[in-house]
């Protein structure tokens, strides 16, 4: 009865848009966790036929040594070039020496068959969030940025533009994001009419949840109306749920988590519940895992104490690297049926990741929810296309 009352309360607060002003963050997290139980469990057996416009996408990191000419486009419909950045002060896209070096490698993608749709992605995880905030803060700044993106996209024959702003810092940023999307879309329509070319696509990578509440400056919600009206689709990044920033092991991209609201099911449900149609969502999937150094090698379950990352500075490991580690060390591999995720451990190293069976179920989940598609971060981490092929097959191709 108490849970029902709390669920009813948060539904009321959400509808009145008062949730962020009268509930403290800890209580908000508790209520959101309880609310996750109210979402209807999708049937993974009631598959929808893939839509004609279904998206099977992946990001190509420009710094990767993986050539675009080696991409098997049988498994993808869309490829993102990641990333370019706006310049300080002018907010025009910076065509740096690095970009000039990497762009020719990407240009070869136009010669691959079957053809794919290409998008230029702006921002990324290492972007200067303050710079994006400044860019979006005035009409003049937004216009400079928008005009520059269109110019660069047309010059290099991209089919669309993608915004990866990580992250809008407060509600003012979210309001300005709405204005940016509106003005950007209208500029794309005008340019298409003037050039007599197809309108450039406009998409955006977004937080896994429609409200950012666990990082940054307190809860702030994405501008759902603008996203629904002006984007071709939004791409929730359904990964990085756990990492070496917390000294205990956890899944990188749990589909379900009965104990919290940090899961793909909850995140996608929040986007749909906020008013973004399922057919405008492209769900993110990781081709990498997160590795910890265990505090005690005999304590190796989910939630085990750790002392930091096992590799690199952030503990990230490409899927191919994980397979090599598992084979070379004879690691114990465990599939968690509740989270729909894998983990492996050997000695003091513990890795949470996805493999073919979990990716297949996640793609089936996306289909059962009526989503527009899925995307991977990132090409080059699955060199023999093992997971990419299984995902494509699960989508129905």
Curated annotation (Swiss-Prot):
Q: Where is the signal peptide?
A: 1-18
Q: Does the keyword Chaperone apply?
A: no
Top-tier EC class? hydrolase
Known pathway: Glycan degradation; chitin degradation
- State its Enzyme Commission number(s): 3.2.1.14
Which BP terms from GO are recorded? Answer: chitin catabolic process; defense response to fungus; nodulation; polysaccharide catabolic process
Q: Disruption effect?
A: Root nodule development arrested at the primordia stage and defect in nitrogen-fixing symbiosis in presence of Mesorhizobium loti.
Reaction catalysis annotation: Random endo-hydrolysis of N-acetyl-beta-D-glucosaminide (1->4)-beta-linkages in chitin and chitodextrins
Q: Kindly give the CDD domains that the UniProt entry links to this protein.
A: GH18_plant_chitinase_class_V (cd02879)
Keyword line: Carbohydrate metabolism, Chitin degradation, Glycoprotein, Glycosidase, Hydrolase, Nodulation, Plant defense, Polysaccharide degradation, Signal
- One Pfam entry for this protein is Glyco_hydro_18
Record PANTHER family: CHITINASE, CHITINASE 12-RELATED
The family note in this entry says: Belongs to the glycosyl hydrolase 18 family. Chitinase class V subfamily.
Explain the purpose of this protein: Possesses chitinase activity in vitro toward glycol chitin, carboxymethyl-chitin, colloidal chitin, and the chitin oligosaccharides (N-acetylglucosamine) (GlcNAc)6 and (GlcNAc)5. Hydrolyzes (GlcNAc)6 into (GlcNAc)4 and (GlcNAc)2, or two (GlcNAc)3 molecules. Has the capacity to inhibit hyphal growth of the fungus Trichoderma viride in an agar-plate bioassay. Involved in symbiotic signaling. Required for root hair infection threads (ITs) elongation and nodule development. Possesses Nod factor (NF) hydrolase activity.
Kindly provide the name given to this protein in its UniProt entry.
Class V chitinase CHIT5
Organism, as annotated: Lotus japonicus
The gene name reads CHIT5
